[in-house]
Amino acid sequence: MTFKILSIDGGGIRGVYPAHILKCFEEKLGINLLESFDMIAGTSTGSIIAAGIACDIRASEMVSMYREHGADIFNKRKSKIPFKKESVATKLMLESVYDSASLSAVLKSVFQEIKLGDITKPLILPATDIGNGGVHVFKSAYDTNFLRDKLVKIRDAVQASCSAPTFFDPHKVDEYLLSDGGLWANNPALAAVIDAQKRLGIPYDDIQVVSIGTGHSIVAYGLM
């Protein structure tokens, strides 16, 4: 029996692209994404979409969220450190570029108080444990041997996965200080496949993955 995994990469505001692709799946194929996949994984901006699908939020609503609140999420904070040449390094170390409170507000409006323990679909949201120098993978409580995250609010897990260093502040969840899952799994497909095999006992040959990226930024280089 085929085990279908949906994996969504990180990529900041470019998350609108996989959200739009999934919107086309819904409209052109007439499918419900939550019912069409057996496991969902997302990193960074992909975690917003993955968690949304796991909560049975339509992709069209996720597209609207990016368009309406993208500017709020990527809202540059006003620096409290006076700008001087010698303070540039200090600013980079002590202040994130964007206001994490704005991201928190948007995620709260989307996910409210839903907890990972409320989700029945296998959900994988990678983050990075910068306090202990390791990986941290949030999971819904689909495995009775893995109940660590059942009381964690989805918005907290998503914010941790989204908190790219220098762009957003690290996010604390319980005793863990967490940052962007893209530091080690910007494409979470492999993490999902491994979990399906080890946790659920799915044979490798039975696994099919739909992995959606966020494209690439075009950067122009020139002489200084």
Regions found by a protein language model. Give the residues of each.
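Patatin-like phospholipase
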Residues: 2-7, 12-107, 142, 147, ...
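Extended hydrophobic secondary-structure segments that form protein cores and membrane-embedded regions
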Residues: 5-8, 38-44, 123-128, 207-219
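Active-site gating loop/helix substructures
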Residues: 13, 93, 117-198
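Surface-exposed acidic, glycine-flexible loop patches that form ligand/cofactor-binding
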Residues: 29-34, 108-123, 198-203
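A short acidic (Asp/Glu
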Residues: 52-53, 188, 219-223
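Short aromatic-enriched loop/helix-cap "lid" or pocket-rim segments at secondary-structure transitions
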Residues: 77-79, 221-224
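Surface cap/lid and interfacial helix-loop subdomains adjacent to catalytic sites
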Residues: 91, 96-122, 186, 208, ...
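Hydrophobic, mid-to-C-terminal alpha-helical segments
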Residues: 175, 193-223
